[in-house]
């Protein structure tokens, strides 16, 4: 946020940070640059956005929403780089919820599950067979839609969530309860063939 922007529009009430980099690869087949690229995009990108905007957040009353991933808390084969980066994003969320809470700033994360018609699904579930397997592994029996994530963000930004901070909120149809592993297995079979 530039000083001129905030001077014109006023303090930031809601900040959503959603940088994501991803590609399937086993750790032994990944370069240090590949690993670093995902860390730079996901974790360092979130750090830079949050650090550079803190001075421009409305205090008290603003909210920060980071977009995480199931790989932050659920190990997934072929995703060591994303697991490490998004776990860092979730811990950064919790730490800043404590630090910035004193200023009246709330910080939470949303963890999207499989969301239809997104770049992430196209990259991680590139075939109909994998898409079907992922959908079948979601307890609610469907992939989410972008509006599911938007609704969660709107809730976290609303006055109804004014006493919620430091929360890592899965919006995944129950996928994080066990279905995540199926994608790792599918990725392994695709990259080995």
Task: Indicate where each model-derived feature is located.
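Alpha-helical segment proximal to the catalytic Tyr-Lys
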Residues: 55, 98-102, 162
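Short C-terminal tail/terminal secondary-structure segment
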Residues: 74, 154, 165-193
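Active-site helix of classical SDR
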Residues: 50, 85, 93
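Short, well-ordered secondary-structure patches that form non-catalytic structural/interaction elements
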Residues: 30-36, 40, 190
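C-terminal substrate-recognition "lid" of short-chain dehydrogenase/reductases
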Residues: 47-50, 142-171, 176
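Short, small/polar-rich loop/turn modules that mediate ligand/substrate recognition or access, typified
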Residues: 16, 101, 106, 164-166
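Substrate-binding pocket helix/loop in short-chain dehydrogenase/reductase
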Residues: 26-27, 34-36, 130, 134
């Amino acid at each position: 946020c530039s000083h001129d922007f905030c001077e014109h529009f006023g303090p930031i009430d809601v900040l959503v940070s959603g940088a994501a980099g991803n590609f399937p690869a086993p750790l032994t087949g990944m370069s240090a640059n590949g690993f670093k690229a995902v860390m730079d995009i996901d974790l360092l990108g979130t750090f830079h956005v949050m650090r550079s905007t803190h001075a421009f957040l409305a205090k008290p009353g603003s909210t920060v929403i980071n977009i995480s991933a199931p790989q932050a808390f659920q190990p997934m084969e072929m995703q060591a780089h994303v697991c490490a980066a998004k776990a860092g994003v979730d811990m950064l969320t919790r730490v800043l919820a404590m630090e910035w809470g004193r200023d009246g700033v709330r910080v939470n994360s949303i963890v999207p599950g499989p969301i239809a018609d997104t770049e992430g699904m196209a990259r991680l579930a590139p075939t109909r067979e994998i898409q079907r397997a992922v959908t079948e592994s979601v307890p609610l029996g469907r992939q989410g839609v972008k509006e599911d994530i938007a609704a969660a963000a709107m809730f976290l930004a609303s006055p109804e969530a004014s006493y919620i901070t430091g929360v890592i909120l899965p919006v995944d149809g129950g996928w994080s309860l066990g279905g995540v592993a199926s994608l790792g297995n599918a990725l392994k079979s695709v990259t080995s063939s």
